[in-house]
């Protein structure tokens, strides 16, 4: 098996290096990842400047682009040879609920799925036990691989920041959701100009049983299938009925 690994925290981030080291015990691995932190890049592609992959001594690559750029480039003729699976992560911090909209970690996996490959995104709910998350992925890949081949979705995995032995198990979950985002942070720079920072993520508002927030909070690995189709199917009929009524008045 040949696995393409990417992330949004950048090539030098601890998470991707720990993940690649563990994955190399079970497969051939090649990293194509951003050359710097591109967190919250979502599925953006770079269209107004060239991408410049830099070939590293160990055979991996870092790219002056987004996570989606990296996977798009790798799978559309840049890499020679077949790739069987895309794994994105390990993200420093969870990607649950509304986080998935902004996540470059998920975007890299979604780009792989869009280009026809099974894909996994993995995040750690903290910054300490990356080895736990890497081991979870390596344990799940042999079990999930054939199932992934039949899915049009990616698998989003969130791992509690605990030693592996303290994990309580695995739960298949739906996404929860957070409260409205915190206000932006207003400051003055050394030139006395006003600058703004995006504020921190809001606290979970729906962390009820069955959500990814609930699972991770209670020591379980959450596994959520994620799709690119954002259609709200449950609203199609009511919206059509409303439209029909408005145009027949």
Swiss-Prot record:
Any one GO cellular component localisation term in the record: cytoplasm
EC class (word): hydrolase
Main location: cytoplasm
This protein's UniProt keywords: Cytoplasm, Hydrolase, Metal-binding, Nucleotide-binding
GO molecular function, one term: 5'-nucleotidase activity
Gene3D superfamilies named in the record: Survival protein SurE-like phosphatase/nucleotidase
UniProt-listed Enzyme Commission number(s): 3.1.3.5
Top-level division of the source organism's lineage: Bacteria
Binding-site positions, a divalent metal cation: 8-9, 39, 91
Cofactor requirement: a divalent metal cation
Catalytic activity: a ribonucleoside 5'-phosphate + H2O = a ribonucleoside + phosphate
UniProt keyword Transmembrane helix, yes or no: no
Cofactor: binding details: Binds 1 divalent metal cation per subunit.
Location of this chain's protein in the cell: Cytoplasm
Matches recorded under HAMAP family: SurE (MF_00060)
Role noted for this protein: Nucleotidase that shows phosphatase activity on nucleoside 5'-monophosphates.
Family under the similarity heading: Belongs to the SurE nucleotidase family.
Name the record gives this protein: 5'-nucleotidase SurE
Species for this entry: Haemophilus influenzae (strain PittEE)
